[in-house]
Amino acid sequence: MTIGGFAVNIYGYGRNTGDIDIFIEDSIENRKNLRIALKKAGIGDFENINTMQFIPGWTDITLNFNLRLDIMTSVKGLENSTFEELLEKAYITEINDIPVYFLDYENLIKAKKASNRPKDILDIEELEKINKKI
């Protein structure tokens, strides 16, 4: 599931980001599925996904154009929700015939508030302006 800056973009606030933050439920099957999805999307085959330790903020893979994929197994502010609950609420779109899940708006705001970094505060302000107009 895509979280962070890319999810912010999907909800209307276009900002540059140097990474794609994804949240997965850590299991052997999900690691295999992630590897298959990246390969299918033409991003590359990252064999080390099968065995690497996922440490939030530290586990990333360099993709094309120096873009990083940051893999997280927990999200600050969302500890009281299971991965399945968040997945059920996710916004889904297709990119190159591949379903891509984005953290739902409400939980994205919750996670941004919990992170409380300057860029997260700006994201919240801009998203709230955009969504008040709708």
What residues fall within each predicted segment?
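Compositionally biased terminal segments of proteins
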Residues: 1-134
